[in-house]
Amino acid sequence: MASVTLRGITHRYYEGSGSVTAVEDIDLGIEDGEFVVLVGPSGCGKSTTLEILSGLSQPTEGNVFFGDKDVTNQPARKRDIAMVFQNYALYPHMTVEENMTFPLKQRGDVTGREAARAVEDAASMMGIDEKLDRLPGDLSGGQRQRVALGRAIVRDPEVFLMDEPLSNLDAKLRREMRVELQELHAALETTTIYVTHNQEEAMTMADKIVILRQGEIQQVGPPQRVYENPANRFVADFMGEPSMNFFRGRIIDGDPPSFDFEGQRTDPIPLSNGSVRPDQEVTFSIRPEHIDPVNSEDGDIVGEAALIEPMGSHFEAHVTLDSGDNVIAMLDPDTRLREGDRLGLRFDRARVHLFDTATGARVD
């Protein structure tokens, strides 16, 4: 096992007559045994970062360290890593056992008996020990992914690199495999760097998440801390389903200062934040689960229930405000509310977030 460090990593490639920056000035430290998830929308640079870590791509600038060793110019075959891909990358003409044994044969420093024992142990760990004589085409998607993971395990690498390994699975199987991956990491304690666009995977699996946008790191930290304290509007909007509600307005001077909603006929909301400036244009944000339905006269904002979506444990109320803006509130299933009803919405003041309207930076 090893710690992993990226220092000043930038990667550019040429397209047409110009260059495109895929990632820029990435600084990231990953501790030995940590499970880190790189998450972000398509094209944000997460897969490029993984390719640089693997040695499949070379950075234009910067260095990659495994422990204290600079591996920037070391090819993939000489790095002590194991990769797992979303398309499994199994040899269709080889049995499960042959697929899992293949990386050990390539290394050439393992005896046949040692290889057989490693495959047996990994297959047992992944629950595929009765499938060793099967071909990949005879297996389900979940079983093929377990073979791919087992093949990575037999290498006993310093670092696991995983690129969207669950994206081809259905929702139920994805959830099951997510749990298995967490159990696997707890058992092996191998440094793992995992790429996904799925925020649920990031929230549930990671010790630390790294949120990327347009090739730059937006925020790094434990999942719950990032969720509760987003560094900017992009992170606030990206993390969470449904996403945050956003309202434009301005700060009114006072003790305490208050927020005046743009286009709303409601009273300004007092704020506990002392760092905002009078007349500063800010975006007021709150998550759907931190909104309560109240009588119209008691609401921070007022509107009409346009759509109610039952979700089992709760329902999501889509409310059209008098200003024309739309808000999503996550409400208790026992709440008595029908489409077309007028209602007020009250915010949990301790859960309010403020972002500078011009820059998107957090100001609270």
Where are the regions a protein language model picked out?
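Conserved ABC transporter NBD signature motif
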Residues: 62-70
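ABC ATPase nucleotide-binding domains
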Residues: 76-234
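ABC ATPase nucleotide-binding domain
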Residues: 5, 29, 65, 250, ...
